Amino acid sequence: MGGLEEDLLRVGAIKFGDFVLTSGKRSTYYVDIKEAATDPSVLRKIASEFSGMIRSSKIAGMELGAVPLIVATALQMSIPYIIVRKERSHGTMSLLVGKFEKGEEIDVIEDVVTTGNSVLKAVNTLRENGAVVKRAYCVVDREEGGSDLLKENGIDLHPIIRISQVKGFRK
């Protein structure tokens, strides 16, 4: 795990400083896994980590951040994947790309978990369409309540890295 942590710091996927998050909240660090996903060797390591953790024969993730992660992991595991889209106002209006059977178990992958709301949205979309979702995986858990929210909704969160494990981290 130390190798991946070092890679995330090296490529600038984890930065320390003064940042304003999407929520408007200030933070002393910023995590952007999309930055890491553009580096083939780092993406390969992330996919390898997920491949050792995933227990279902199909995975899913929310566009945009999770897409390179689910594609790389699906290729490594030779399993199909589902992309969960954000709101659609054109085309077929479908929120899901990919197929699965009602009652099929699907694991969800996310890049970064903070509050857990993004993962929960993906999980709820999948469940509303008949999937069984019990587990979610992320590259980095910011440890800001996301795991608790997911647990309350029947989802076990399995992070590759918890932010408190990262060298240089301080709240």
UniProtKB/Swiss-Prot annotation:
Its EC number is 2.4.2.10. Orotate binds at residues 114, 142. Pathway: Pyrimidine metabolism; UMP biosynthesis via de novo pathway; UMP from orotate: step 1/2. Keywords: Glycosyltransferase, Magnesium, Pyrimidine biosynthesis, Transferase. It catalyses: orotidine 5'-phosphate + diphosphate = orotate + 5-phospho-alpha-D-ribose 1-diphosphate. GO terms for molecular function: magnesium ion binding; orotate phosphoribosyltransferase activity. Its cofactor is Mg(2+). It holds the Pfam family Pribosyltran. The keyword Glycosyltransferase applies. One of its GO terms (biological process) is pyrimidine nucleobase biosynthetic process. InterPro entries: OPRT, Or_phspho_trans_dom, PRibTrfase_dom, PRTase-like. CDD domains: PRTases_typeI. Belongs to the purine/pyrimidine phosphoribosyltransferase family. PyrE subfamily. Catalyzes the transfer of a ribosyl phosphate group from 5-phosphoribose 1-diphosphate to orotate, leading to the formation of orotidine monophosphate (OMP). PANTHER family: OROTATE PHOSPHORIBOSYLTRANSFERASE, URIDINE 5'-MONOPHOSPHATE SYNTHASE. NCBIfam families: pyrE. Homodimer. This is Orotate phosphoribosyltransferase. It comes from Thermoplasma acidophilum (strain ATCC 25905 / DSM 1728 / JCM 9062 / NBRC 15155 / AMRC-C165).
